[in-house]
C-alpha cells in the first residue's frame, strides 16, 4: 500500500522519546507498505462511529489510520500513547 502522512502524525512522532515505540512504529510502517490490505496487519480494529478509520495497537501506543476498501493508499493520522484520553475528541 502507498503510505501518506498527515501533519498531525508527523508532529506527534517528532515528540516521541520512547525508543521502543519508535522501533515498533517503523516496523509497522514497513508492514503496511508491504501489505495488500489491512487484513494482513495484526491488531487492526475499526474506530466506532467512523467509516474508514482504524486503530492499530503497537504496545502502549495506537496508530490511527484512514483506509478505504479498494484504495491502495493509507493515511497515517496520528500516533497516540494509550491512556484514558486517547479516543476523546
Model-predicted segments: where are they?
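Enriched for short, Lys/Arg-rich terminal
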Residues: 2, 8, 19, 41, ...
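A short, compositionally biased N-terminal segment around positions ~18-40 that is enriched
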Residues: 19-38, 67
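A short, surface-exposed loop/turn module that caps and links secondary-structure elements
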Residues: 30-55
Amino acid at each position: 500500500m502507498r503510505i501518506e502522512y498527515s501533519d498531525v502524525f508527523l508532529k506527534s512522532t517528532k515528540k516521541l522519546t520512547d525508543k521502543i515505540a519508535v522501533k515498533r512504529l517503523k516496523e509497522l510502517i514497513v508492514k503496511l507498505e508491504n501489505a495488500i490490505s489491512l487484513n494482513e496487519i495484526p491488531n487492526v480494529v475499526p474506530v466506532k462511529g467512523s467509516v474508514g478509520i482504524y486503530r492499530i495497537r503497537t504496545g502502549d501506543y495506537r496508530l490511527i489510520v484512514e483506509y478505504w476498501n479498494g484504495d491502495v493508499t493509507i493515511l497515517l493520522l496520528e500516533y497516540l500513547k494509550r491512556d484514558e484520553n486517547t479516543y476523546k475528541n
